[in-house]
């Protein structure tokens, strides 16, 4: 049985991928790591700063790791505020993981993003192979990361694989500084019976994906026959092409008194306007059977059910369309 390390395990993807990996491969075979200190007695978690090369190599060697899911990164909006930190975390961390993988013979997963594209890229049906000229430091690190993974694959034989993920919607992880976090915030506001003020314009269309589809795609790619993978690294995957207004309308079908306002933040709006509205995922479908299960309606039902289970049922005033006197901005 493979021995797995997840870096950035407490982040947006890691919070759901780590338990999914443990369900598939057994908890004892999956080591989680992040910057937070380990809790006493937790043998399946270790503190790790991925910018420290010796620490990365030591953990991989000591735990006899076969596969690294390298998720540690600063997300788009945070990265724009801290570009030097973003380069250090996103690039040095990946380099250290790839170097350790070269030394110890590990397989590596690296999550790329729609941020790897820019305003000169075709925005609808963005092809697998196309121009990549991002305008954010986050996007620059994703393109550079794709190329670095390709280099380690061709030069050193490291089995590095990756996906270009759309904006991700998670019922588990709180918003973490991403440009598409508005969707998560919107669902959470609805469950809390709050009016929501969206930081993107109402008609900003972007490719999005529900996290259960993303974690399944990640695991399926890593199990795929390498002989069938034309690209290995940075496959386009897609979930749904939606706008904030469309998500709000779908939520309102379940919570009639939910309402959203739209006051675009210049920084995040500019980032969103440079990203694809939809991705062409035909290569992923053909090479390893990528098939998302959640459209907007299914995602909305599942998100609200999960968030309600965590926080309590909807208020009757929402369920029956009666305005909530305590509504405010989320």
List each model region and its residues.
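C-terminal substrate-binding subdomain of Rossmann-fold SDR/epimerase-dehydratase oxidoreductases
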Residues: 199-201, 207-321, 325-329
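NAD(P)H-binding glycine-rich loop region in Rossmannoid oxidoreductase-like domains
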Residues: 50-89
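Conserved beta-loop-beta element that borders a ligand/cofactor-binding pocket
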Residues: 113, 147-172
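N-terminal Rossmann NAD(P)H-binding glycine-rich loop of SDR-like oxidoreductase domains
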Residues: 4-23
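NAD(P)-cofactor binding segment of oxidoreductase domains
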Residues: 62, 81-108
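Glycine/proline-rich active-site loop of Rossmann-fold NAD(P)-dependent oxidoreductases
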Residues: 143, 156, 169-184, 211-212, ...
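Conserved Rossmann-fold NAD(P)-dependent oxidoreductase catalytic core, especially the SDR/UDP-sugar
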Residues: 95-137
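A conserved pocket-lining segment of Rossmann-fold NAD(P)-dependent short-chain dehydrogenase/reductase
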Residues: 80, 131, 165-175, 185-209, ...
């Amino acid at each position: 049985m493979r021995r797995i390390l997840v870096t950035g395990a407490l982040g947006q993807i890691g919070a759901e991928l780590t338990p999914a990996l443990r369900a598939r491969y057994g908890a004892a075979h999956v080591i989680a790591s992040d910057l937070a200190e380990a809790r006493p007695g937790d043998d399946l978690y270790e503190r790790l700063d991925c910018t420290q090369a010796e620490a990365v190599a030591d953990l991989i060697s000591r735990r006899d790791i076969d596969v690294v899911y390298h998720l540690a990164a600063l997300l788009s909006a945070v990265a724009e505020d801290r570009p030097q930190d973003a380069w250090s975390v996103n690039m040095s961390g990946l380099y250290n993981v790839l170097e350790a993988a070269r030394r110890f013979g590990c397989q590596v997963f690296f999550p790329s993003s729609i941020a790897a594209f820019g305003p000169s890229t075709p925005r609808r049906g963005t092809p697998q192979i196309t121009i990549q000229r991002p305008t954010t430091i986050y996007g620059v690190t994703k393109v550079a990361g794709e190329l670095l993974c390709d280099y380690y694959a061709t030069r050193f034989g490291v089995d590095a694989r990756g996906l270009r993920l759309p904006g991700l919607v998670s019922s588990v992880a709180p918003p973490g500084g991403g440009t598409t976090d508005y969707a998560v915030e919107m669902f959470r506001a609805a469950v809390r019976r709050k009016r929501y003020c969206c930081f993107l314009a109402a008609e900003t269309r972007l490719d999005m994906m529900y996290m259960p589809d993303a974690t399944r795609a990640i695991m399926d790619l890593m199990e795929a026959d390498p002989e069938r993978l034309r690209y290995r690294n940075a496959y386009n995957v897609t979930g749904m092409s939606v706008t904030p207004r469309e998500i709000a309308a779908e939520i309102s079908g379940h919570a009639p008194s939910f309402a959203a306002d739209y006051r675009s933040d210049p920084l995040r709006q500019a980032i969103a306007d440079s990203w694809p509205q939809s991705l062409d995922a035909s290569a992923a479908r053909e090479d390893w059977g990528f098939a998302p299960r959640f459209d907007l309606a299914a995602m909305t039902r599942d998100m609200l059910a999960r968030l309600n289970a965590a926080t309590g049922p909807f208020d009757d005033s929402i369920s029956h369309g009666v305005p909530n006197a305590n509504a405010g901005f989320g």
